[in-house]
Amino acid sequence: MKIGVISDTHSLDTRIPNAILESLKNMDMILHAGDLMELNILDSLKSICRDVKAVWGNMDPIEIRKQLPEKQVITVGEYRIGLTHGSGAPAFLIELVTDIFKSDNVDIIIFGHAHYPINEKRGNILYFNPGSLTDKAFSPFNSYGIIEINEQIKARIVKI
């Protein structure tokens, strides 16, 4: 299974660039780790992929928070993926998201918030932040992620 991972699409232009949609159209699933700002982002993603899941982020308005969960646990084959946004100081994000999923027995934790990519294995858990798709406030580049799950997990960051 090939999973496209995006986060932090909040910016002055709330549309996902066509080139990014094109690169994500062959995914089996797309996960958005929050800070959508507008639900039309999900409509764009659903136009290219049937299986789209998302959580709300700290910048999302109440209308989005009413429609999306704060966290999800998704099973793909024999692997469990935790999806959340995160909050607070970026230096402590991994600890925070670990605590959010401490009783969920996950193999991967996908999160956003920091705007810079993380692809790091600690113990038995892969921590994956795709970076921001549209905002370079805290990173020198925009990015998204691809996670491939077969017998193993392979994850990579794609710089835009």
Task: State where each predicted segment sits.
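Residue-level detector of beta-strand structural context in well-folded domains
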Residues: 71-72, 117, 145
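Active-site-proximal segments of metal-dependent phosphoesterases and phosphodiesterases across multiple
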Residues: 60-105, 135-138
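Short, positively charged, low-complexity/disordered linker segments
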Residues: 98-120, 126
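Active-site neighborhood of phospho(di)ester-bond hydrolases with catalytic His/Asp-centered motifs
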Residues: 5-7, 29-35, 53-58, 83-85, ...
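Beta-strand-turn-beta hairpins that frame and shape the catalytic cleft
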Residues: 1-3, 73-82, 121-127, 149-156
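Binuclear metal-dependent phosphoesterase catalytic core
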Residues: 77, 104-106, 128-160
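N-terminal active-site segment of His-dependent metallophosphoesterases
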Residues: 1-47, 51, 60-69, 78-80, ...
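Active-site environment of divalent metal-dependent phosphoester hydrolases
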Residues: 11-15, 37-41, 59-65, 88-93, ...
